[in-house]
């Protein structure tokens, strides 16, 4: 609701700018719209950050903050809109509505998690992300309150702690968890090797794994607002919890990678 109001206010501001600058050139209204939209969204994020305080990152969350979750959704939708994404999502019916799950997907662009956050809001998926993302002022605190976790792959002990915390969140029905097993974005479109350790999260929590693939987000950076970009997120399969616990993490990584590889070729 608040996000809809924000968009309406920005649209009205842009319309006013077009009228005010009409004696110069109507195209001047375009950068004004973008600037006003960005500034108002910054105010939106600041307000939600104030509403989610205080935050103590040294301890796991006892309860997810719904205002922080809504703020993440707003940011995700805004950036997808700003980037000109035209999302096409299939296979949502495969995602469970009665249990938490581990969301596993390939990684092509910064827009990958934003699309999930903005458009799969119903399933309450929080991501394990690199520490630099969680260190962003204001945004990092909001993300932490929404259940997002940093993982330092260079520090095995810290990485294990994150995996155990993520499993605990799912056990306590706080949120589902999303990971990108490649560990980083692919630069040439080819699927990178999967880190098997992250699959321990699902085994510890005894939850199913939703395997998905994303296509087209790597094109967004080249286009931005010039023209919309069709992007595709396909939910390929839900691996039942019983099967997850019966397989090794290496087998889960190999199987998930194979399914994603097949999905990208389809």
Question: Model regions: which residues?
Answer:
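A generic local structural motif
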Residues: 75, 87-91, 113-114, 163-166, ...
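Short, well-ordered coil/turn elements that cap or connect secondary structure elements
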Residues: 82-84, 122, 143-145, 172, ...
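Generic preference for hydrophobic
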Residues: 89, 103, 127, 233-235
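Catalytic core of membrane glycerolipid acyltransferases/transacylases, capturing the structured
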Residues: 52-74, 81-82, 96-155
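Membrane-anchoring hydrophobic helices of lipid-metabolizing enzymes
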Residues: 1-14, 18, 22-100
